[in-house]
Amino acid sequence: MIKDVYELLLSRKNEIEKQISLLDETSNNLLKEKIKEKWKEYCQTQGKLSTVLAIDGGMWIKELRSGIVYIVNAEIVKAEGFNVTPIDSKALIGVLRPGNMAKERVSLLMQLLELKLGLKHGDKAEYILFDGSIVKKIGKHKFSTKISLLDDIDVMDDKIYSLEENDEELMHKYLVAENQLVMSALISKYKGKLVWISKNSKSTELFQENISDVSLLELFTKNCGYTIGIEKKISSENIISPKASTILSNASFYSFYTRLKEGEKILKIEMFNNEIENIISILSPISIKGYPYPLLKVHTDVKVSRQDRERIKQLLNIKKKDIEWWPSQLF
């Protein structure tokens, strides 16, 4: 019962508070030196006015006794300064039965729509901004055997071939493969334009501490600047498509952290080149509170709000729970 939780919390209050406080004085001094070695203060006051594309997606799933209802959508916008214009969008709605790995598959569907929009319209601007990370787009699954069944698909086609598979486990693998095929085509065509931006990275790869790199940088730095770029490689173990493997396996990319505006949040950026100050000069002039406005705008457009969810349920005649505390799985 929740009463037991409160009793446990009171008995361990001091211990938990110490862990929340993060660091002692000795650790503070050591980390300050560590960060000083890797953080370069750099404020871009002028910057370059370039055209950029920003892409993001939204998703919603509803678990029912009959299966999983899902909705995904994605949008691409073009920005010149703070003038943002929608270019194209895609949406899907369907039911997964019985619904195993539903969240993972719906997330892959959303991601696939994003990548397809980038591939279709990548020639319309100098840079293409995605929310998230390269590794997340590739997937962290490890596959002992490759799947070549989808290697001959037309990646420019609007069709999602994986949805034709009824077996849920196979569909999941096909979705990973289809994402990787579109991703490899995107890299082949627009490698130098691609930029991934993450605002919630939990990575510890730079400082190798048990606290995230972002948390440490936000704790010990306030000015705008960036960290040294780290070269990374896409692991061949994570590539399930033989055709995609020719482009993606062991491909190098660079990651670094930056703060675009003084006192604002730290962002993690990944690209296929190490031109850090150049991309900062592109992003700084179009940022609000330290985050690129085009990505903020497209995120707002695709987000499935609470009001949207209620309206969708009404349109689909999904009845509302009579008892609010009743578990959704039994509804």
Curated annotation (Swiss-Prot):
What's the stated role of this polypeptide? Answer: Involved in DNA double-strand break (DSB) repair. Probably acts with HerA to stimulate resection of the 5' strand and produce the long 3' single-strand that is required for RadA loading. Exhibits both single-stranded endonuclease activity and 5'-3' exonuclease activity on single-stranded and double-stranded DNA.
Q: What is the effect of changing H299A?
A: Lack of nuclease activity
Q: Which Pfam families match?
A: NurA
**Keyword Hydrolase on entry:** yes
GO BP: any one term = DNA repair
Q: Which organism is it from?
A: Sulfurisphaera tokodaii (strain DSM 16993 / JCM 10545 / NBRC 100140 / 7) (Sulfolobus tokodaii)
Q: What is this protein called?
A: DNA double-strand break repair nuclease NurA
Q: Name one GO molecular function term.
A: metal ion binding
